[in-house]
Amino acid sequence: MPTIANQHKTWNFIKRSLLLFIGLIIVGCKSQENSITFQSMDTAMTIKSFGKNSKKANLLAQKKIFDLDKILSAVDNQSELYALNHSCGKKFKPSYELECLIKFGLEKAEITGGAFNPLLFPVTYEWGFTSKNFKLPSKERIEELLLLTDYKKVFFEDENIFLPEGMAFDFGALGKGFAGDEAIKILADNGIESAVLDLGGNIQLLGKKNGTENWKIGLRNPFGGTDPSDIVQGSVPLALELSDCAVITSGGYERYFTADNGKKYIHILDGRSGYPVENGIASSTIIAKNGLYADYLSTTSFILGKEETRKIWEKAGDFEFIMIFSDGSISYSSGLKDKITLLEKFTAEEIIEK
């Protein structure tokens, strides 16, 4: 694969215009805006919208996200999901929102053969990613807990769900995407035609910037303490021009721990093995119309790797993807050729064609 020439000088003007957010970088709209920043779903969030009714719309969207957090938190003992997870196999009637996520998650678990699995809470908790009491579980303990993640044992009867005792859902890989979709709907219903949502690094775009041009956003450099490439740590390695879509990235560069054996373990687990993913991917980004779909695919693509993601992309045809690898190389789908600009020197560039 060809080495990419350094484009620092050529694109300095673009890089200076980028505003850093938590997981992505967004070029702000210069017209009048209304913005609200708050904490929900265990992360910082910002909603920016533009238009006559933007202040009211932002508050309504914020309220919806707060309401969803009360439904979907796996650790809040007052949440609906917590109640379901502790229903001890008895019938439970979920809300519309919770039912949507359960059915979506179970469907995707079936499609991926359990690689993506919304029932990994017992395993995630054992690793300490939920409690932050990190530890390296024994192989025997992982195998024992995997018995509690069999998505085929969960079933609906009329409006009720039956979740076997000891099993527990965790929608950390879906919740923010779903919340973004719901917030976008509220903004649109209130007459907003242009908005940017940053939900803990999940970016969702409504319409175009100023109603006329694409938004410029940039992916965060996924490399941590040691950088195997020439990419400058903390830089903006690439920019995208997009509108009316979700841009969601999965990576192990923010949530991880180093065990006593000196090995780094990231929070993204392969549902089939119960172990953190180790496949050379530093980050995987999905661009799709729907935030829930993009959230699911960003995690799934990170787990399955480039070739399996390529197969899904070729078959589905309704998303684009970018993968940055630990060796400093980059691969991205051909639908992004006219939308992506590399701002840093990658060790290699691959454009994936159908």
Q: Where in this protein do the model-derived segments appear?
A:
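Hydrophobic h-region of N-terminal signal peptides that target proteins for export
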Residues: 22-28
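Mature catalytic core of soluble alpha/beta enzymes
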Residues: 2-17, 28-354
